[in-house]
Swiss-Prot record:
Belongs to the TAF13 family. Keywords: Activator, Cell membrane, Membrane, Nucleus, Transcription, Transcription regulation. Component of the TFIID complex. TFIID is composed of TATA binding protein (TBP) and a number of TBP-associated factors (TAFs) whose MWs range from 14-217 kDa. Interacts with TAF4B, TAF8, TAF9, TAF10, TAF11, TAF12, TAF12B and TAF14. Interacts with the members of the polycomb repressive complex 2 (PRC2) MEA and EZA1. GO terms for molecular function: protein heterodimerization activity. InterPro entries: Histone-fold, TFIID_TAF13. One of its GO terms (biological process) is seed development. Expressed in roots, leaves and inflorescences. GO terms for cellular component: nucleus; plasma membrane. This is Transcription initiation factor TFIID subunit 13. Residues 30-74 form the Histone-fold domain.
Length: 126
């Protein structure tokens, strides 16, 4: 057995593939279309290679899974998982943190707008 980085990477990818419940070729794709559009937006071809999209998808799924597990560990001390647990984990990555805060603020604005619309609609019915 070789101690080269390539050999280590190949053996770790084999162990990851062996640890999954589905074969590598038949696994369910979750974000293929969205990732193709994102890759195109970041300068890739309009129709990137399926292998490239699958690789990016594997990286994204692994990142989200790891982040969720870490947030769950933090939240288990309180007994429940909160959005703040995720914000705490990405606190050092300012672009991600700012984007999450922006999206959370937009979510709150939409919630308030829906609530105001529902109240107006109920007043019209009465």
């Amino acid at each position: 057995m070789s101690n080269t980085p390539a050999a280590a990477a190949s053996s770790s990818s084999k162990s990851k593939a062996a640890g999954t419940s589905q074969p590598q070729e038949k696994r369910k794709t979750l974000f293929q279309k969205e990732l193709q559009h994102m890759m195109y937006g970041f300068g890739d071809e309009q129709n990137p290679l399926p292998e490239s999209v699958a690789l990016v998808e594997d990286i994204v799924v692994e990142y989200v899974t790891d982040l969720t597990h870490k947030a769950q560990e933090i939240g288990s001390k309180r007994g429940r998982l909160l959005v703040d647990d995720f914000l705490y984990l990405i606190r050092k990555d300012l672009p991600k943190l700012n984007r999450c805060r922006e999206l959370l603020a937009m979510q709150e604005e939409l919630k308030q707008a829906r609530k105001a619309f529902d109240v107006d609609e109920k007043e019209l019915v009465d």
